[in-house]
Amino acid sequence: IGSYNHLLGRCAESWMASPAVAKRLSGPFPKSLDGARILLPTDDTAIRVALDQWLDKQGVRPFIVGEFEDYALLREFARHGRGVAPVPEVLVDQFRKESGLVPLGTAGKVRAEFYAISMERKLRHPGVVAILEKASDVFDSA
């Protein structure tokens, strides 16, 4: 079965934590992540590779306490104070309002990518086309 990826957009990756975890971090961001308990996407994803490279470039050695395949579960662990979590910038306001997480900073030039996956090369369904068009209002052009 063939499928086609249609890029919806890219956005910066932010780091968020519960207020209690954020208070325990010391020093300026991103050095405050050194030794901190963090929650990450699984290591077989492009965003994880980019985050690992960014952390290494910052000279930061966090303590990885969990790896997740979806942001909903990652958010719940962060909400319950289990660690600092990377969050796509487009979800920061939602995570702040719904989970009480606070932003700590962004991961430099690391970008999360979002795709619509379809069975058609050229999208025809009006609803899917509308989503693709609206995505440019949500995502940055980086």
Residues of each region from the PLM?
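Structural motif corresponding to alpha-helix initiation and N-cap regions
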Residues: 1-2, 71
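Flexible hinge/capping segments at coil-to-helix
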Residues: 2-43
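Short beta-strand->loop
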Residues: 4-14, 89, 97-111
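Secondary-structure junction motif
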Residues: 23-26, 36-58, 124-132, 141-142
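A late-sequence structural motif
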Residues: 102-142
